[in-house]
């Protein structure tokens, strides 16, 4: 596999640990993930103010913590972005994406609300998605207090967060929920079936591979794994993608999710959804976070931040 990795990404690839999220090693995996993600938290920046709030959760469920990133100085209502972190539906927190959310604020001129949704296996589907929907409703209903322009709310996330982004777009459409101007599911985890060609092609134990993906989906779906799974859990199963918001998505060439992302982007276009899609040669899952100094990583990040900025701009009538 190493010879397929982009030259700029090989150094970090060589030091990656093996991914083992199996049930017998899960607590160790969660501990490792927490320690790894903590190393990426935000350094102080006087241009961005970060705060935490607890908001009403779904019906008969606990409150949900959200982490809010906003410009320290703002003079008008800004577009809002609901960000959903990754972690295979099993690990992670808003803090792991502090640096990225700060960049969204500074470069896309927006306010970011990152949702600390409940995690599997303790809280399988639909709990994580319902937490995200509750956060979307809260942002929309409290937009004036948050200084957010309610006509310019986007949703975005990476990996499992990308899967939840795609699912949330479907759910908001079908429930006739808050209006979403743009969705940005990045390298999204959207297909529980694990039967696409790239699922069998990407086997290296240093990468999120088929074994890890099956384990993740089993934890997220719980008792319904292997059954006729809801498209709100696995958006690749959705048969109707019409009426979804304009979309930007991307994936690395040697990412397990390559095939399902390509299919998803293609089906969005067939459904008449304005869609931009990028694939990065030699990119493994999460490459731009794992090797942030590589030129290809910086290009990928610049391109999706640029797409978000453009989508959030006011349209003159």
What residues fall within each predicted segment?
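A glycine/proline-hinged amphipathic helix-loop "lid/cap" segment
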Residues: 1-68, 313-317
């Amino acid at each position: 596999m190493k010879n397929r990795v982009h030259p700029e990404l090989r150094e970090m690839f060589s030091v990656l640990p093996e991914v083992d999220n199996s049930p017998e090693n899960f607590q160790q995996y969660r501990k490792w993930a927490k320690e790894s993600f903590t190393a990426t938290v935000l350094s102080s920046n006087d241009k961005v103010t970060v705060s935490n709030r607890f908001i009403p959760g779904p019906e008969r469920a606990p409150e949900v913590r959200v982490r809010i990133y906003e410009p320290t100085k703002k003079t008008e209502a800004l577009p809002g972005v609901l960000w959903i972190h990754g972690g295979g539906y099993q690990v992670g927190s808003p803090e792991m994406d502090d640096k990225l959310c700060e960049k969204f604020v500074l470069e896309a001129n927006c306010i970011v609300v990152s949702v600390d949704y409940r995690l599997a296996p303790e809280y399988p589907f639909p709990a994580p998605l319902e937490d995200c929907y509750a956060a979307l409703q809260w942002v929309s209903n409290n937009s004036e207090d948050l200084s957010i322009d309610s006509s310019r709310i986007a949703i975005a996330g990476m990996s499992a967060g990308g899967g939840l982004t795609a699912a949330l777009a479907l759910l908001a459409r079908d429930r006739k929920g808050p209006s979403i101007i743009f969705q940005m599911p990045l390298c999204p985890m959207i297909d529980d079936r694990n039967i696409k060609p790239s699922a069998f092609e990407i086997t290296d134990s240093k990468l999120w591979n088929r074994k890890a993906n099956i384990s993740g989906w089993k934890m997220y779906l719980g008792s319904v794994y292997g059954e006729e799974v809801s498209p709100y859990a696995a958006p690749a199963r959705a048969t109707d993608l019409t009426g979804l918001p304009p979309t930007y998505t991307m994936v690395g060439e040697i990412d397990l999710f390559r095939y399902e992302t390509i299919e998803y982007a293609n089906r969005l276009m067939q459904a008449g959804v304005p869609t931009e899609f990028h694939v990065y040669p030699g990119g493994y899952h999460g490459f731009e976070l794992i090797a942030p100094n590589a030129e290809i990583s910086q290009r990928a990040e610049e391109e999706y931040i640029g797409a978000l900025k453009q989508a959030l701009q006011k349209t003159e009538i």
